Amino acid sequence: MLPKRAYPVQDSNVHSQEKKIIAGNWKMNINHSQAVSYLQELNWRLIDNGHDFDSCEIAVFPPFTDLRSVQTLVASDDIQISYGAQDVSAFSDGAHTGQISAQFLKDLDCKYVLIGHSEQRCLPCYPGNNSAINELNNKHDGLIANKLLRSFAAGICPILCIGDISPGDHFDATLSRFRSVLSHLKAISDKKHSIGYALGSKTHFLDSDQLHMLVAYEPSSAINSGNCANSGDIVRMAAAIKDIVNVRVLYGGGVNLFNASAVFNEDLLDGILVGRASLNASDFASLIKTCCL
């Protein structure tokens, strides 16, 4: 058995030392050959704009089929853009057709992986059957917790996406789901001491430790809408998440050239996750420039 606290944590004051991050989620766009020209253009535009990579990290999340091309280009051209995958399997290996393990992603030098994005976590509609919906939510939370543990074990930093499942959800419902994932994380890790997980007491989850992951708050009502959530709601959610556990928090959903800077520069936020507005290298470079002026 590994000693407790063998899990990936950082000192509680690390937040103040870490740079902010602007990440682009390509979703199911941009093929492997387009990815090469995209990254080359984004890189030279950032350099031409005088971007300070030491103060603001830039990351992209290509489709799985692009990752080898991205890895080769980043290594050969010494590009200072991080990258990650859009999902990961909850299993380490075996008969799981179509799934990609965390170790496979690590072998491709992925730094990050998105976990629990609402577009991955859509639930079927069960009119009037709240118990069925709750049961499915519970299973999803357990699956997500396993994905987190697989990422930790492989040395990849997960970005846990949380948000309302339906437009009628409230602030407390989103936080309840976040707590549920952490609760599953604790339950699983208590049974898998080889991973060395031990959760402390702060709000029944963590004490002064920081899980080596990020949390992206993405309300479903804002995703693909072109409109961000209310700034007050964003800050309130970021504060509530950080009160539960010491993690860095990003915002995603409706981020574009015109609202990105205001959201990015909120004191309690550690960065933004951009979708549609990151699909064109020139436009994404302009968005980054407005945030980092």
From Swiss-Prot:
This protein's pathway: Carbohydrate biosynthesis; gluconeogenesis; Carbohydrate degradation; glycolysis; D-glyceraldehyde 3-phosphate from glycerone phosphate: step 1/1
Superkingdom of origin: Bacteria
Cell membrane recorded as keyword: no
Active site: H117 (electrophile), E218 (proton acceptor)
InterPro entries: Aldolase_TIM, TIM_sf, TrioseP_Isoase_bac/euk, Triosephosphate_isomerase, Triosephosphate_isomerase_AS
Role played: Involved in the gluconeogenesis. Catalyzes stereospecifically the conversion of dihydroxyacetone phosphate (DHAP) to D-glyceraldehyde-3-phosphate (G3P).
Designated name of the protein: Triosephosphate isomerase
Species assigned in the record: Tropheryma whipplei (strain Twist)
Lineage: Bacteria, Bacillati, Actinomycetota, Actinomycetes, Micrococcales
